[in-house]
Amino acid sequence: MRDIEIVKRIEELRIFRSLIGVDLSSSDISRIWGPQYSKNSEMVECNQLNGEAEEKIHLLKRSLSHFLFFDKVKFIGISGSVGAGFAKKEDDIDLFIVVEDDFMWIYRLFLELSNLFGGRIRLKKDKNDVKDKFCVNLIAEERGIVFDNDIFNFHELMFLKPVYNEKYMRHI
C-alpha cells in the first residue's frame, strides 16, 4: 500500500472511532504503522480507556500466571472491546496469544485442564454469563502470524493492547 493510501485509511479509521466515542491516538498510529504516519494524520489525542476496560486489563494482569506455561508463551494481548477501550461491565476479556512453534495444541490442552478447576475461561456454551471471563480469541504459533485481510482482523490488530512481552508487538 502506498503512503497516501495508508494515511487515508488511518484518517477514515480515526473518524469512525471518534463517532463511536473512542478516538485513535498518535501513539497507536506510531506503534502500528510507524512514526512517519502519526505526523501525517490530523489527530485528536484522546485515546483513554474507560474505567471498565482498565479494570479488566488489571484483572488479566493479576491472572497472567494462569496463561504462562513452561516459558513457551511469547505474547499475550487484549483485543476486542477491552483493547479498543470501550468495554462494558458485562463484557468478557478477549485474548490474543502467541506461543512457540509446535506448542499450540499442548498449550490449548493446558488451558482446558486449568479451566476445569478455575472456570475463568469462556466456553462456547457460556452465552449469558461472560462477565470478566477470558475469551481466547486466537492462539497462534510464531510461524503462523499471518492473517486474512478483512475488517475483523484489522480491528483486532488495530486495538490490540500488549499485556505480556510488549516488545513482541513488532512481530505481529
Please state what every model-predicted region is.
Residues R2-E90, V99-I172:
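Catalytic core of pol beta-like nucleotidyltransferases
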